[in-house]
Amino acid sequence: MSVFSLKIDIADNKFFNGETSPLFSQSQAKLARQFHQKIAGYRPTPLCALDDLANLFGVKKILVKDESKRFGLNAFKMLGGAYAIAQLLCEKYHLDIETLSFEHLKNAIGEKMTFATTTDGNHGRGVAWAAQQLGQNAVIYMPKGSAQERVDAILNLGAECIVTDMNYDDTVRLTMQHAQQHGWEVVQDTAWEGYTKIPTWIMQGYATLADEAVEQMREMGVTPTHVLLQAGVGAMAGGVLGYLVDVYSPQNLHSIIVEPDKADCIYRSGVKGDIVNVGGDMATIMAGLACGEPNPLGWEILRNCATQFISCQDSVAALGMRVLGNPYGNDPRIISGESGAVGLGVLAAVHYHPQRQSLMEKLALNKDAVVLVISTEGDTDVKHYREVVWEGKHAVAP
């Protein structure tokens, strides 16, 4: 077997207290999922058991939630955007989301509204999709360097798309300014002072994927010991972890938060025990994770309940893409993009590492470990996906 060393910096969470949040509970997840189930075309995304890979890596189970199958959008993000927009409209028109369907909501809206957001691709596509479904307008801002394919996917949903010359976090601030000037509703997946309601709804919407996964694992007769969650601002990681620890308890779930080393604001915050922002270009292939300022709502859950934080190089994500796209033994093939594959990439990088055994012990990975991984996206940038998987871009160096 080849041996090579990729950068995987692991920090234990010294500020863990196991305090869960009622905002991201099982009951809130059930409410969100009930809404999503009423959207035409809803079905749970697959939970794929990679049994042969698990055997190779020395664990009991590797379970990958494949979000490339979500509503034909190739990513999970619409779960948050659609749910938040629906909650916003229900509040505005005094409607009850528990009894309302997406179609009924569309018919109840008496005016044209414009929803604005900043995105690296998937969240904006989800907001654009929801706005289109409801007959509304969307204006989507993207940071510099955004892939044209991700821009086109948003334009194809009838939204306006503006690529700035700023990084993600500065683009968020620009979006806020323009929204205030034009009277648009901002649907952003990060929070700040005076802006928490919509990001809370978005995070609650993300929990649908976790509720599905728990149901699927119960049908398989397995209970997860580990979960790897990738983080940008930490909205998905916080919303999903909040739900999972409500189901299994923080003490019984070894949760690992993974980020690119060029945008590792959650990792640095985890080391300090308080929010740390990261600036600059944040140049990483993991475009969906290239965020330098943690969502305070997500950060609180991660600080309280995450077991460990990981900061890793881009080659870890690229390795994950290749392993998932070229399955071992009889395992199913999973098309996973840069931000989607980094969790599995960590497992693969540990397997090939010269200090494999000590890393396995550090992460409490052993023959009894049942590991849940979320592949949050498919090949949302096909050109770059092929450069990585076909052409060997960001290769490992033995």
Swiss-Prot record:
InterPro entries: DiNH2opropionate_NH3_lyase (IPR010081), DiNH2propionate_NH3-lyase_sub (IPR019871), TrpB-like_PALP (IPR001926), TrpB-like_PALP_sf (IPR036052). The keyword Lyase applies. It comes from the Bacteria. Binds 1 pyridoxal phosphate per subunit. The active site is at residues 77, 120. It is an enzyme of class 4 (lyase). Disulfide bonds join 265-291. The modification N6-(pyridoxal phosphate)lysine is found at residue 77. Optimum pH is 8.0. Induction: Slightly induced by DL-DAP. Its EC number is 4.3.1.15. The keyword Disulfide bond applies. Keywords: Disulfide bond, Lyase, Pyridoxal phosphate. PANTHER family: DIAMINOPROPIONATE AMMONIA-LYASE, PTHR42937. Catalyzes the alpha,beta-elimination reaction of both L- and D-alpha,beta-diaminopropionate (DAP) to form pyruvate and ammonia. In vitro the D-isomer of serine is degraded to pyruvate, though very poorly; other amino acids (L-serine, D- and L-threonine, D- and L-beta-Cl-alanine) are not substrates. In vivo allows poor growth on L-DAP or a DL-DAP mixture but not on D-DAP alone, this may be due to a poor promoter. DL-DAP is toxic in the absence of this enzyme, it may inhibit enzymes involved in the synthesis of pyruvate and aspartate, as well as amino acids derived from them. Homodimer. This is Diaminopropionate ammonia-lyase. It comes from Escherichia coli (strain K12). The gene is ygeX.
